[in-house]
Amino acid sequence: MNDRRDDYRDTVFLPVTSFPMRGELRRLEPRLLARWAERDLWAELRRKSRGRPLFILHDGPPYANGHLHIGTALNKILKDVVNRARQMAGFDALYIPGWDCHGLPIEWRIEEEYRAKGRDKDAVPVVAFRAECRAYAEKWMGVQGEEFRRLGVAGDWADRYATMDFPSEAAIAAEIGKFLLSGALYRGLRPVMWSPVEKTALAEAEIEYHDHTSETVFVRFAIDPARTGRADLSGVSVAIWTTTPWTIPGNRAIACGAGIDYALAHIDSVELGSLARPGEKLLVALALLPEFCAATGIATHHVEHVFKGEELAGLVCRHPLAGHGYEQSAPIFEGDFVTTEQGTGFVHIAPGHGEEDFALGQAHGLEVPDTVGPDGTFNAWVPLFAGLHVYKAAGPVMKALEDAGTLIARGRLVHSYPHSWRSKAPLIFRATPQWFIRMDGPENIRGKALAAIAETGFVPARGRTRLASMVEQRPDWCVSRQRAWGVPITVFVERRSGEPLRDPAVMARIVAAFAAEGADA
């Protein structure tokens, strides 16, 4: 047996470098970063890049509200790779980092500190609260900036920007002023996604969808013979289905589909425990009648007549809580959004709690009742439910309907439902006066955005279709928030008429004040 141990190192062609065998990054990375700083590598790159074509990476800034997490780090590292690659490809990759310092995430953190200390936010002057938000954001900008530098992200960290810097606040006010002067900024009453926990409207980007179990109800709306003039429909009720029983107090109408077939069903017998009544007559979409009977415990029935939806439009029903403080009627209107996918083929319309409800109500001059306050509780003037929170209202509303004899059935549905990305609480649609920017009209923001999307390269290419679809369908942009920490909408409004003041000189004075003293000026 040969014990000789051959050394083959000299026979293998390997590169020779000064790199150590071990990375020892914990020890060596700080040295490397210190050497970059000592050389002022960023300034050196800028000097060597003079005259090159610029490459600007438009970076959505992070929130200054805590240590970096893996998502923030990955986002910034990938962008750093892009910038470095373009720099080495012959461009001047000028990257100026920044932070989003306004808005709910930071305000929510300050409120959490208040709650932990038993402080009442409402007792704190707004300017003092804003100062605390500013100090909090300033602190975390410093922390995050050091963490980004520790990751090796190259950028002009000495000249960073922040949305709370006075020049930034002035620029935001100036842009809002342009929309005001052009007429694109307007104040309107409209249902928006509302967070009862944060007491504010939320943007689409602030909304998450999670599975949620909702209470559902089938409710009968009795046709009012005195208002209808249809003897053949005496004693007939329209059946509706909703996943938001708490919106019943805000009902002002019913929608039907013009081309949908509706069965006038005579109930012959019901199962034990059903709230349906033998002998009653209900109007339900013909295609949904079997599902309706199964869900409501109707054992047998027969169809007396089939109507088209257009024949039912114009009928008037009583509110299901009539006699209990709800004496308003519920007329039936055609709605192009009504389908036979689920429910009864009729849609209960609460103009203050849904986009389609609101639009139909506006088209027919319906009032928009103010039933729910900013904190999600029914207002004092709402019969039966004043002071009750909408999250807890399903049971009491169903009990009131049952006592009134208008509840047909109840159930539960697990479905995807909007939640606040910050509080994780369910949201509601709530009609409130808000400030909007028109997507259409003379400014043609939608058209300009779609044209820009068409001219932009997307990787992957399907991103263009997705973004264009979102822009095509989005309603006017709600820019107002009912919060303290942000750039205020700088509009003076005539107290009696509500008409905004559109004066370029006034707007210029506001912008100058913001530039000098910030939004607290």
Residue ranges and their predicted role:
Residues 47-110, 172, 240-248, 255, ...:
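N-terminal catalytic cores of NTP/NDP-binding nucleotidyl/phosphoryl-transfer enzymes
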Residues 53, 215, 328:
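Residue-level signal for beta-strand positions within conserved beta-sheet cores that form or flank
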Residues 2-18, 22-25, 31, 35-39, ...:
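Residue patterns forming the tRNA-binding/recognition surfaces of aminoacyl-tRNA synthetases
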Residues 22-53, 294-297:
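Histidine-rich, glycine-flanked metal-binding segment
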Residues 96-98, 263, 491-494:
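Hydrophobic, aliphatic-enriched repeat segments that assemble into extended interaction scaffolds
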Residues 253, 260-346, 355, 359:
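Protease-associated
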Residues 89-90, 294-299, 365-366, 518-519:
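Structural alpha-beta junctions
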